[in-house]
């Protein structure tokens, strides 16, 4: 029977994963809080102490740091000497290690964190097990991200979890532990960058990097330009988060934390042109992110307008020569890998709020057409584009989009009709192929009526109002196709 050690701080999906492993004939071992959760779920699991024959000591500081654990993980199964030594010491082989670490980054994100709290959240046993298992990836499966659970199970069930896949997991482990160690160094080193000022000149500010992950703003490589300002950093972070949602060539332009233009295309040059045309006035002085390399042709387009920051996964040498003609524009090169951090933090007086990131995307097949008229294919494309953008717009938010760009954005209004008025009045085009997208439900039918007056023929919204039928009836009255997603996307 194969053996797996499970010890996680992020308990997302661990019960379901553990149950599936037992069905695949794995014997499970665990520690502390992970074992308690599995016990409560009636998942067969043994304590790591059953492997080590040694109790957890020092409030759990020492529990897996033992030869019975690390010998079973590190043994090279192609070396008879290793296997003989395990047999002599009565040590069992460990086939899988599932570990994620104490939440150090989340802990030190609290401005009031004490030194003792920070120290207690430095994981020792977890990184040691991860590194040991990753080193021996030829024989041991190592999982650090809950997002990988399902794929691992699928491969195990198909008997296709091979060395190449284990190597890909190994790379994730060393990336994770490197980021973790970097965060510790930065915290204790006091790695903060003093900024010229904060949101306004009368406010002092500095930038604390808790992670040097190359796919974040904190880990961006600045190739040119002035120091990033407080507002640049916030806007750049918002721009990067949105552009990463797109697989096709895409461009996002942001001003004051709100998208002002989003475009997609067959090429990145087309995508930029669509984003620029979406609001050629507001993009002036904005932040632009592109999810493809900046070519000389694109650089000429970017150079022709005033931009504060340009973000891309790569700039060609020729593109850099063009863009560097403006001495102040900030050029940031960033890996467009999706950020694995699943939580976000907001400080409030006396504390801070923590929540999961709003990354959920409703599959099209789960969306419901609730009107007599169904959307055309082109209207569906417009809806899905807008639905991808609307979580990044301050509420109340209304977006108008076609199948290649946003064409009007109404952001941050105190009522939904007000947001719709702004989007409709600023729209660069309205025709049968343009969809109206709402981040929240319609409390009554007035927004739909306003949309009808402007010629809108397709609407997508979460639904959930006690007066949903009023909006549906209004849509039917005007021959509008309406889709309900069941998921809202407020942003404050």
UniProtKB/Swiss-Prot annotation:
GO terms for MF: IMP cyclohydrolase activity; phosphoribosylaminoimidazolecarboxamide formyltransferase activity
Swiss-Prot/TrEMBL catalytic activity: (6R)-10-formyltetrahydrofolate + 5-amino-1-(5-phospho-beta-D-ribosyl)imidazole-4-carboxamide = 5-formamido-1-(5-phospho-D-ribosyl)imidazole-4-carboxamide + (6S)-5,6,7,8-tetrahydrofolate; IMP + H2O = 5-formamido-1-(5-phospho-D-ribosyl)imidazole-4-carboxamide
Regions crossing the membrane: none
Keywords: Hydrolase, Multifunctional enzyme, Purine biosynthesis, Transferase
Family membership: Belongs to the PurH family.
NCBIfam families registered for this protein in UniProt: PRK00881.1 (NF002049), purH (TIGR00355)
Name of the featured protein: Bifunctional purine biosynthesis protein PurH
Species name: Staphylococcus aureus (strain Newman)
Top-level taxonomy: Bacteria, Bacillati, Bacillota, Bacilli, Bacillales
């Amino acid at each position: 029977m194969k053996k797996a050690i499970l010890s996680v701080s992020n308990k997302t999906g661990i019960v379901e994963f553990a149950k599936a492993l037992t069905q695949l004939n794995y014997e499970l071992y665990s520690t502390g809080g992970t074992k308690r959760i599995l016990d409560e779920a009636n998942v067969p699991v043994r304590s790591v102490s059953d492997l080590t024959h040694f109790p957890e000591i020092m409030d759990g500081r020492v529990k897996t740091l033992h030869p019975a654990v690390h010998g079973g993980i590190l043994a090279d199964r192609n070396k008879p000497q290793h296997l003989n030594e395990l047999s002599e010491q009565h040590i069992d082989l460990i086939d899988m290690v599932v570990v994620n670490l104490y939440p150090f980054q989340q802990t030190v994100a609290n401005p009031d964190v004490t030194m003792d709290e920070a120290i207690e959240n430095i994981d020792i046993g977890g990184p040691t097990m991860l590194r040991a298992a990753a080193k021996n990836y030829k024989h041991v499966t190592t999982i650090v991200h809950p997002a990988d659970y399902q794929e691992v199970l699928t491969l195990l069930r198909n008997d296709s979890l091979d060395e190449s896949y284990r190597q890909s997991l190994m790379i994730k482990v060393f990336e994770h532990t490197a980021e973790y160690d970097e965060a510790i160094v930065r915290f204790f080193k006091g790695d903060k960058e003093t900024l010229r000022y904060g949101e306004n000149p009368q406010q002092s500010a500095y930038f604390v990097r808790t992670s040097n992950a190359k796919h974040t703003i904190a880990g961006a490589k600045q190739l040119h330009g002035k120091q990033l300002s407080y507002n640049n950093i916030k806007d750049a972070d918002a721009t990067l988060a949105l552009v990463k949602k797109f697989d096709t060539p895409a461009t996002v332009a942001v001003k004051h934390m709100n998208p002002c233009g989003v475009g997609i295309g067959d090429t990145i040059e087309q995508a930029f042109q669509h984003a620029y045309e979406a609001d050629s006035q507001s993009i002036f002085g904005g932040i632009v992110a592109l999810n493809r390399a900046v070519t000389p042709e694109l650089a000429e387009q970017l150079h022709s307008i005033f931009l504060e920051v340009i973000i891309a996964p790569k700039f060609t040498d020729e593109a850099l020569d063009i863009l560097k003609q403006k001495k102040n524009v900030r050029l940031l090169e960033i890996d467009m890998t999706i950020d694995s951090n699943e939580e976000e933090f907001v400080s409030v007086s006396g504390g801070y709020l923590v929540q999961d990131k709003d990354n959920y995307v409703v599959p099209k097949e789960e969306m419901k057409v609730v009107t007599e008229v169904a959307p055309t294919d082109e209207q569906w494309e417009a809806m899905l584009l807008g639905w991808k953008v609307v979580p990044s717009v301050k509420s109340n938010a209304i977006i108008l989009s076609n199948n290649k760009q946003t064409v009007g954005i109404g952001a941050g209004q105190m009522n939904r009709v007000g947001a719709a008025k702004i989007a409709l009045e600023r729209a660069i085009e309205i025709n049968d192929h343009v969809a109206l997208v709402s981040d929240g439900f319609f409390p009554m039918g007035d927004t739909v009526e306003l949309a009808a007056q402007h010629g809108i023929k397709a609407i997508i919204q979460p639904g959930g109002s006690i007066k949903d039928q009023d909006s549906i009836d209004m849509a039917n009255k005007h021959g509008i196709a309406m889709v309900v997603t069941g998921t809202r996307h407020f942003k404050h």
